[in-house]
Curated annotation (Swiss-Prot):
A cellular component term, taken from the record's GO annotations: cytoplasm
Full protein name: 16S rRNA aminocarboxypropyltransferase
Record keywords, A-Z: Cytoplasm, Ribosome biogenesis, rRNA processing, S-adenosyl-L-methionine, Transferase
Residues binding S-adenosyl-L-methionine, per UniProt: 17, 62, 83, 102
Superkingdom classification of source: Archaea
Reactions listed under catalytic activity: an N(1)-methylpseudouridine in rRNA + S-adenosyl-L-methionine = N(1)-methyl-N(3)-[(3S)-3-amino-3-carboxypropyl]pseudouridine in rRNA + S-methyl-5'-thioadenosine + H(+)
Length: 165
């Protein structure tokens, strides 16, 4: 599966997971929307959740600061899907739900799409990478067992409801 990143370059280059993926030839960076190929776009503002029904040969992520990640930033061609409830393991946003960096977003999407080994490959480039799969193993496996977006949303809601108890 091809991984493409619409790269804004507005965060710390030393902490940028997209740049590191590109250095290892695991993702391609694109500086403009026109350069970025259409695929399944991981978009936190999307109306539909990513599910195994979205299996594809190309994932696209936007790499930018969370401070600038408004809806307008995600004007990228393709089918837009939101990742369901997952918890960040990266040092910047550790423990924060939904505040994933680019490699975590790709890894979460790959796991949901049944490509667990590829997710592990990406995360192996980061000292904290294994922690992402450890923190999210149960929900990722449950999301991967879903048929479609509505089932993923139901599983997500169960996690959100459990957190309120």
């Amino acid at each position: 599966m091809e991984l493409h990143v619409r790269y804004e370059g507005d965060d710390d280059p030393e902490k940028c997971t997209a740049r590191k993926l590109a250095r290892f030839d695991l993702a391609a960076l694109h500086r403009t929307g026109r350069e970025t190929p259409a695929g399944v776009v991981l978009n936190p503002h999307a109306e539909r959740a990513l599910s195994p029904a979205d299996d594809t040969d190309m994932l696209v992520a936007l790499d930018c600061s969370w401070e600038t990640a408004g809806r307008a930033m995600f004007e990228i061609d393709g089918e837009h899907r939101a990742l369901p409830f997952l918890v960040a393991a990266n040092p910047v946003n550790y423990g924060q739900p939904f505040q994933l960096n680019t490699v975590e977003a790709f890894a979460g999407a790959l796991a949901i799409l049944g490509r667990w080994e590829r997710a592990e490959e990406l995360l192996s480039k980061f000292t904290w990478g294994h922690t992402f799969l450890e923190l999210n193993e149960e929900p990722l496996r449950r999301y991967a067992d879903c048929e479609d977006s509505s089932e993923v949303v139901a599983v997500q809601q169960a996690y959100l409801d459990a957190g309120e108890d």
